[in-house]
Structures are given as structure tokens and as C-alpha cells.
Amino acid sequence: MSKYRSPKTKKSIQATLQFKSTPTLVKCPKCSITYSTNSPSDLVQHKRYHDLHLNGKRWSQSWGDIINRVEALKTEKQLKYSMVSEKDKKVMSFQLPSQTLYEEDEYIVMISPKKANEVKAALDLMSIVNEELNAPHDENAFWSEVDKSGKSQGKAFIYVKKNRAVGVITIEYIENTNRGKWMVLDTKAIVPNVVPDVKLGISRIWVCRNQRQHGIATRLLEVARKKSIYGCIVNKWELAWSQPSQSGSILAKSYNAAKHRSGKLLIPCYI
């Protein structure tokens, strides 16, 4: 008797087609970075970038030497007190002299090029600044390094508020270099054959987005002209700009622009 083998039943396999998702690019309305919502690395990068550009870099109290504290806002210059005299039952008023109060968590520090930790922290901050300003990332040696004599060619000042670096200015020494020029503010044209005797050059100045319009940039400028050269306070017009951005031009106009007899506004710059 012959045996018949039943044919084996083939298992069906479900085919799955995998399509790569099309990257969806969006631009953050607050920090202005463009990133892909489908990319995990982009999402992480945006989160970091967003926080740094809006709120500044977290800053250790051990970084930098405090050279200026920000005065607290006072509603009254003097405090009035009154008391009742036991002798004649009259109310007598007197005033205490006003005292300068300072914010405990708001100050400006100067970076020492000889202290590696604070230099690294400042360089990390400058990376953020240069990204936003679309500026070169290799122009930090003048304040972050020292020459053979142990001196630097500039200064970096950081504005710290609530344990975050929310502003920075880097200053280059340009005294006796003939690099000073006058720039026509509205056209960016350089005035020929005139060399102002400028002493300091503003390489970078930046304030994080959430702290703008609070006078921080002006405070940084004031500290720079008073503290960059030991024992010397330079005049405002001796503080020169380097290719100011649109917002930088507005700041320059209010801080140290000079009106020419032609009616044009000029700002000191250096090249």
C-alpha cells in the first residue's frame, strides 16, 4: 500500500515597506535656530542652544574676579523715621543718610588668562556669542592668552546674574597702533585721512535675549573703559567698535556717537 505525503504548507510572510520620514525643518521663533523635528540629535542641540541664547550660561562663583557690583534699585534715596518725644509729646522726624545697596546675585567679573577653568568657561560662552553674531570663532587669543612677559593683549568681562553669564564684552588693546577710524553710522563708510587716537577696541559685546533692554550692555561698556587699563579711565570716544551689528550700531549711537558738522553721526571704530 503506497503512502502519500501531504505537501508542506508554505508560511506566508508579511512584507513591510519602510520609508524614511521626510525631515521637518522648523525655525524656533525665540532663539531663531532652524532644526529638524525628526532628528533626536537636532532636538537635543536645539534644547541646549535655546536655553543658552535665551538665558545665558550657568556660571560658577569661582570663575572670574568680581570688579563691579550692580546697585540695587531704590525707591527712596533716604529713609524717613519719626519718634515721639517723651518730654513734650511732640513728633520729631529725622532722616538717615542714604546707603548704597547692591544686588547679591548680580555683578561683573574679569577673566584671568592664567586661570584655565574660567578661561574655558569664558571660551564656551564666546562660542555661543560667535554663533549668534555669525562671527569667527578664533579671535580670543588677545584676552585668553599671555605673551612671554605674562601680559595679555586685552580683557574679557562677564556680566553674571543669578548664577548665569548673561552678557560679555571682550576688549582689545589698540593704543598707538593707528588702527582707529571714524565710521559714518548709517552708511558704514570710513572717513578717509582721519585717525582718532582710540585706545580700546570692542571685539565682541553680547547680552542673552531674555536680559536685553535692561542696561546690561551699557554697564559692560562702562566697566570696560574704566577697568581695562589699570589706573586709567579712557574717554567714551576712545572706545572703538569693530564691524558693529544692527543692534550694535543702535548701542553705539546711544553710547558714543559724535555728530559731524555735516549732520551725519560718526562712531569710533578700528580695523
Curated annotation (Swiss-Prot):
Q: Could you tell me the Gene Ontology terms of the biological process aspect for this record?
A: mitotic sister chromatid cohesion
Q: Which GO terms describe its cellular component?
A: chromatin; nucleus
Gene3D superfamilies xref list: 3.40.630.30
What EC numbers are recorded for this enzyme? 2.3.1.-
Zinc finger annotations (CCHH-type) as residue ranges: 26-50
Keyword entries, A-Z: Acyltransferase, Cell cycle, Metal-binding, Nucleus, Transferase, Zinc, Zinc-finger
- Spell out the molecular function terms from Gene Ontology: protein-lysine-acetyltransferase activity; zinc ion binding
Q: Which residues form the N-acetyltransferase domain?
A: 109-271
Q: Which Pfam families match?
A: Acetyltransf_13, zf-C2H2_3
Could you name the domain of life of the organism this protein comes from?
Eukaryota
Enumerate the PROSITE patterns for this protein.
GNAT
Localization per Swiss-Prot or TrEMBL: Nucleus
Q: Which InterPro entries match?
A: AcTrfase_ESCO_Znf_dom, Acyl_CoA_acyltransferase, ESCO_Acetyltransf_dom, GNAT_dom
Q: What does this protein do?
A: Probable acetyltransferase required for the establishment of sister chromatid cohesion and couple the processes of cohesion and DNA replication to ensure that only sister chromatids become paired together. In contrast to the structural cohesins, the deposition and establishment factors are required only during S phase. Acts by acetylating the cohesin complex component SMC3.
Q: Which family does it belong to?
A: Belongs to the acetyltransferase family. ECO subfamily.
Q: What is this protein called?
A: N-acetyltransferase ECO1
Tell me which species this is from.
Answer: Kluyveromyces lactis (strain ATCC 8585 / CBS 2359 / DSM 70799 / NBRC 1267 / NRRL Y-1140 / WM37)
